[in-house]
Amino acid sequence: MVDTELHTIKLPYPDKDDRTVWVYVPSHSDGEKLLVVYMTDGQNLFDDNSTPHGSWEVVKAVENEQKSGVGNAVIVGIDNGNAWRDSELTPKSIGEVQHLEMLCEDFKPEGEIFDNFLMNTVIPYVENNFPVCTDRQNVAVCGSSSGGLMSFFSAFEHPEKFGYAGVFSPAFLCYTREDWAKYLSTKIVENMPYLYIYTGNGDELEEMIFESTEMLYELLEESFYPYDRMNE
């Protein structure tokens, strides 16, 4: 058996300082290849002391999945750019960004740069250095809020790579219904990823996110997204 390890590495991010990437490798058999989940907001995933909001307790979740026999996964957490988070995790190509008053100062949509970093720097490094599967049925992308928007975007841009997308409290409200409809009409192909979309509605902002998520569900159905590739 190979023991559990949590690695932190630095990878070059375009026009900014090197970015910290966390790689959690659970205990596994020697030579075993594991499914892999690429997640945004890496500093929020593993360490309660690295964020004022607490962590996702990802290690505990993976250990619980191991014990229940459901599966075993490498978790790759990509740190956000702190003051640049909103910019990094908001794509430009979907449409004109709405609700700018909610976003960071000096906001500029640069989600495509993050997507390029994920696809051409992070994933190749992980696949070359850690025991992960590379086929889409064992590769997922996941995030929340702006990170949920980004995971949705990356999954739609690269359905040949991602078989699953975890999309939590996604910032779909950043674009109009019309822009979303136009974007989806150009992206849905035969073999799309499974979408697990979830949001609450506990406060005013969450209610706005909830309503925009319902809107996106409707558009997915209107665009004939495969029903068996979405959670209800």
Where are these regions (language model features)?
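Non-catalytic cap/lid and distal C-terminal segments of serine-dependent acyl enzymes
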Residues: 1-232
